[in-house]
Amino acid sequence: MVNFSNKLTKDQIPGWEEYYFNYKMLKGRVNEYTEQTKEGTQYRRRVLKDFSKLLDDEIEKIVLFMIEQQGLIAARLEDLGKRRARLQDIPLLQEITELREDYRSVGLDLVTLLKFVELNANAVRKILKKFDERLGYKFTDYYVRSRSNHPYSQLQQVFRHVGIGAVVGALSRNLSDLEERQGSYLNIYDQHPLAIPKDPIIDLITATADKLTNSTNFLRFLGQHALIAQADSTAGTEDEQHVGEDEYHLMSLVLNLANTFLYMVNTYIVVPTADGYATSLGAAATACGAVIGSMAVAQVFSSVYFSAWSNRSYFRPLLFSSVVLLLGNVMYAMAFDLGSLTILLLGRVLCGMGSARAVNRRYISDCVPPRIRMQASAAFVSASALGMACGPALAGLLQTNFSLYGLTINQITLPGWIMAFGWLVYLIWLWILFQEPDLGPDVKDFYEGSSSSTSTRYMEQEKMEQGFTEHLLPSEQDEEDDNGDEEHNETLSSSTTTLRPASSVASAYTLLTPSVKVQLLIYFMLKYAMEILLAESSVVTGYYFGWDIGTVSVFLAVLGLSVLPVNAIVGTYISNMFEDRQILVASEMALLAGVMLSFKLTVEYTAAQYVCSAVLTFVSAEVVEGVNLSLLSRVMSARLSRGTYNGGLLSTEAGTVARVVADGTITAAGLLAGEGRLLNATLLPALLVCVASIAATLSTYNSLFY
């Protein structure tokens, strides 16, 4: 493994050596501080002051040189602009070609500058981590808090590359103007950004800048929801891409996305009618929590065995999932004529046992080529969101009542029959068109924990992921590089062990940093609040406002349809204006406000108050989920990006447990407090969990800096 000091020296740009971060000197100073503190000859406050000054001086050196280089690039652009102006009246093809190449040369120099900043940013991050490890201080937390939020922050100059966007804009506009217009008189500012033809050098600059700052867009923002390992757009060889294309089967991917969509429809199609079904079988309306939540209870266990099963096959778990869901929905529909609440609950449990979302996620991660993996991840999230919206909407359309061969077909049983038919069609489609990918013995050994496998494929994936997982604070890759500072003769087998996925719940738990634990708590909180809102909506609106099934269905469908627009706004605009941690805290506060506004504190409780508070709660929860998973996908250990106990499974389990607890809360509150006090009784725990998650977020706020 390469020593980072040597790597830093090797990758330096000739002529710029004196402007790089002096990692070797600072590392030596850390070693001195370590010895002095052991001997008692150095005080903590003095160490912090001295090291802070050294860091400030090094970062200032980098920033001033970066600004100087930006000025030189701007001056070159100004000169090129004058040359372009002279060609306006008498355009000469040879001159235009030369001018275009000169603009591209400026673009390459900008890429070089960005790589200079990236290498220095890595050095800053690593020396901060090394200081904390050696001396046991929380210096990183102090330094980030005091420097990153200061109005004259030079640290932000390094990590946010202020001013680069203006240079990219100038390059894009001038290169676009120099292209053959073929009769078009549109300026780039008159076109949508996605419609502007981009020169390859602009794509290279954008990819390099994105790698440095983790800048996001809607597609990447959606894709990160799935917690699926993505490839670095600037990494990977042509051979790697070619192998991925050979293994890729479009229809199999579509079948996985269809499974995700149908399962989410299956989950939420019963929400508007669950209370009516419970009362028709002699139970209380609040037993809807048990009806809805029984599916989530089973999903807690099914997610684990499906994730493990997908180590060996994708077709068989999908086949099993379809059969189980078909039988579960038939049982759900027949419970009405059998007059059995037990059959109803068993049917929902059986549906939960068919949750194959872990398989769907793993298929995208392992069998979709890096070139389109982000699009596939975004499609996975979109399929879930659309299923969530279509479920209640479909329930609102099933307003009928007749008998067929002795079976009652009405608005209560039709969701079960419709979903059973849907899973039957899907089962046939799956049997005919799904193509089982060849995982190969190495991949199976890697996931199953065999020490004989070198797992080359996944070591290459690890290299590709490094571009999106480099942050200011400690990461799994930091640990590997720091080990390289101390040991230069690590074997291939030890490297493979470092990359090996977690083999048990206990080993997965040891990989969770405090920040990751807090983010899983946040995920629990938002799913708890959303489930309380959705699951009790039919009972609350029926009790206070007299809403029928159709009205509740429309209300829930509108909430579900808000998911994609909200993510589009956050992913395209807001996340590029603010840091993720800032958006996270603000949206958590908004969620808390939504929960507080939902309480019935006066004699009269209006539909306007309920709808406004519900929309605020739901939309805020969606923003929290998107930003939280975006952060989680970057700070979680690389070893949790694959294997049975992966990051996606952990987040799914956290969310599923939250739904189980929320549905149990609704049922218990209904039995103990009755429908009249159900709303406040269920909102109080949601309020407490929300406050706890905000406090936990603030306690780890500085560790979310990148």
Swiss-Prot record:
**Would the keyword ATP-binding be found if you checked this record's keyword annotation?**
no
Q: Tell me which family the UniProt entry assigns to this protein.
A: Belongs to the major facilitator superfamily.
User: TM segments?
Assistant: 251-271, 281-301, 318-338, 340-359, 378-398, 414-434, 520-540, 554-574, 583-603, 611-631, 678-698
Pfam families, per this entry?
MFS_1
Q: Where is this region: Disordered?
A: 475-498
How the protein sits in the membrane? Multi-pass membrane protein
Q: Provide the SPX domain boundaries.
A: 2-145
Locations listed in the record: Membrane
Q: Which GO terms describe its molecular function?
A: transmembrane transporter activity
Q: What is this protein called?
A: SPX domain-containing membrane protein Os09g0521800
* GO CC list: membrane
This protein's major location comes to membrane
The alphabetical list of record keywords is: Membrane, Transmembrane, Transmembrane helix
Write down the InterPro entries for this protein, in alphabetical order: MFS, MFS_dom, MFS_Domain-Containing_Protein, MFS_trans_sf, SPX_dom, SPXM_SPX_plant
Q: Acidic residues: which segments have biased composition?
A: 476-488
Query: What Gene3D superfamilies does the annotation carry?
Result: MFS general substrate transporter like domains
